[in-house]
Amino acid sequence: MVDALREARRVLTPRGILVDVRPVTAPMVVEVVIATRAIWATEVSSSVGAEDNAAADTAIQYALSCEWFVFEKRHPFNFEIYCDTAEDLKLYARMHRRMRAAEIPYEALEVRLCELSAGRTARLRCRRSWILSSYRKK
């Protein structure tokens, strides 16, 4: 990672911006949503990515200590995925490493979705916290 930051420093213009966007190492929240209101939620544990985040944090700290970049700002946000069924969520998760490793109870989610919809249009919303940080090249 330090090599990647060194290369970013090399190619950035003076005072150019380095953007670091990654998920927070925290449980995802899966909700049953009707209209815009969550009517039920559960947390899904996923420790995949914790080592990646730690390595990235270490590399960033090294780059800051070498004064390659100056921290500018940090902005937390939620990334949300909407699915009509638990099977749709399962198909999406198969394509993404961090979600693939999460212990998502698909069958239980589908049962809960059917129970709570009661004829209304209900969807699953998977919400994960992310951080966008920016650093300026010195």
Predicted features along the sequence, with ranges:
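A short glycine-rich, Lys/Arg-flanked "PGG" loop and its adjoining helix->strand segment in the class I
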Residues: V2-I17
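Long, contiguous hydrophobic alpha-helical segments, chiefly transmembrane helices and signal peptides
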Residues: A8, D20-R22, Y82-C83, A93
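Conserved short hydrophobic patches within well-ordered secondary structure
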Residues: T13, V21, V32-V33, A50-Y62, ...
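Conserved class I S-adenosyl-L-methionine
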Residues: I17-E51
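Exposed alpha-helical structural elements
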Residues: V32, I39, A59, D88, ...
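Localized chelating/binding microdomains
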Residues: T36, Q61, K73
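Acceptor-substrate binding/catalytic loop of class I
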Residues: A41-T58, H75-I81, R97-A102
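Conserved Class I S-adenosyl-L-methionine
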Residues: S65-K138
